[in-house]
Structures are given as C-alpha cells and as structure tokens.
A protein has these predicted regions:
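Extracytoplasmic thiol/disulfide redox context detector
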Residues: 2-93, 170-171, 205-218
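Conserved strand-to-helix beginnings and helix N-cap segments that scaffold or border functional pockets
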Residues: 65-68, 95-99, 193-196
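Structural microenvironment flanking redox-active thiols in thiol-disulfide oxidoreductases
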Residues: 79-108, 112-140
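C-terminal cap of thioredoxin/glutaredoxin-like
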Residues: 141-218
C-alpha cells in the first residue's frame, strides 16, 4: 500500500495549486481601466486616517435610485475606519436646485429622511421639486416651515456646500452618476461590465486595498 502516500501528496499539491489559482483570480477580479479608473490627480480626503468613499448622485437619476437600495444596508456594514458620504451632482440649473435641496436637508439635520423622500417624490410620484412653492411644501412634510426652509436654503453654509459640490464635479471629472470616489484615488462608475448591482463590490475591493495601504503606513 506504499502508493497511498504519493497519492495523498499529489492530492494535497493539487489542492494547494487550486487555492493559489483561486486566490490570484480573486485578487485580480477587478482591474484598473476595466472596472474602475485611477484619478490623474488624487484629492485630499476629509480624514486621512480613514478610507473615504464619496457617492456622487442625483435625485433625478434612476440608476442612483436603484443603487440607494444597495447603499442603505451596505453602509451599515462598513468598518469604523471607512468614511462614507454623499455629494450631489451639479451639471445644470435643475441639478443645482436638487443639490440645494440636499444640502439644506443636511444643514437641518434631516438628511436621512429627505434622501428617501426626495427619491420617492421624483422617481415614483413624478414630481419635479424645482419650484419654490413645491420645495416649501415638500419640506413642510418633514416638519420644516417655510421661513425656516428659506433661511437655511439661502444661507452661506448651503451656498458654499453647493459650490464645493460643483468643484468636486470638476476635480473628479464626473461625467455620469452614480459615481463613487474611493479615498480620493479611484473612480467607480457603471459600465457594461459593472452594473448597479456590482458597483459596491468594486468599491469594497478598493476599500480593502486602501485599508491595507493605510495599515502598512503606520
């Protein structure tokens, strides 16, 4: 029965080669230029000790609306060293109005309520949310009276937030939404290969890549 030992060795080696091949395939599952882009000029993140993920979106984008159903459960699973936040797109006057809506909600501390509310109003109810009276009515539904809404939406803080969002659009060369920027270095957008349901898989891959880099830097 001496042949048993060589047979076991061959099986063991075959299994090791399989694991090696599988791990390499996993490591190379997402590659630059195919699944994500490397930004020409990295941007400064708001907390260098964390891996930053910024979602550039628009309330009027149906793909952003679809992604939101993935974003909500996903962000609850993020490690403490990952900083996730949203930045509203600002290509044209309509988007800038919606950006002002978003940053007004942030200033009022009702961002988590307004996001699903605005998506529902625009995507499912067919509302535009662009006129003053329409926006006043919309915010009143969240307990914000007209005077308070007008004061906040025209404040220096909200004006500056919209301006900064516009600057980020230019800096990151955003041409479509949803787009996610990982740690100021990588841009992940929907493509034929990366659909809405896979965007966060690519982001997770890049998060781990940056977490390893940060860990090796300390």
């Amino acid at each position: 029965m001496a042949f048993i030992k060589p047979l076991l060795i061959r099986k063991h080696l075959a299994w090791m080669f399989f694991l090696l091949f599988f791990s390499c395939a996993q490591a190379e599952e997402y590659v630059a230029g195919r699944h994500y882009e490397i930004l020409d000029s990295p941007s400064v993140t708001r907390d260098p000790s964390k891996v930053e993920v910024v979602e550039v979106f628009w309330f009027g984008c149906n793909h952003c609306y679809a992604l939101e159903s993935y974003i909500q459960p996903w962000k609850k699973t993020l490690p403490k060293d990952v900083d996730f936040w949203k930045s509203h797109a600002t290509w044209n006057p309509t988007l800038k109005i919606h950006a002002r809506l978003f940053y007004s909600a942030k200033a009022l501390g009702i961002e988590d309520k307004i996001i699903p509310g605005a998506f529902t109003a625009i995507q499912r109810e067919g509302r535009f949310l662009t006129g003053n009276s329409e926006l006043e009515y919309f915010f009143r539904g969240f307990g914000v009276e007209k005077e308070k809404y007008l004061s906040v939406s025209n404040s220096f803080g909200v004006n500056n937030a919209v301006k900064q969002a516009d600057n980020r659009m230019r800096q990151w060369t955003i041409t479509g939404v949803p787009t996610l920027i990982v740690n100021g270095k990588y841009k992940v957008s929907g493509t034929r290969e990366v659909g809405t349901d896979r965007l966060l898989d690519v982001v997770d891959f890049l998060i781990e890549k940056e977490r390893r880099f940060l860990a090796s830097s300390y």
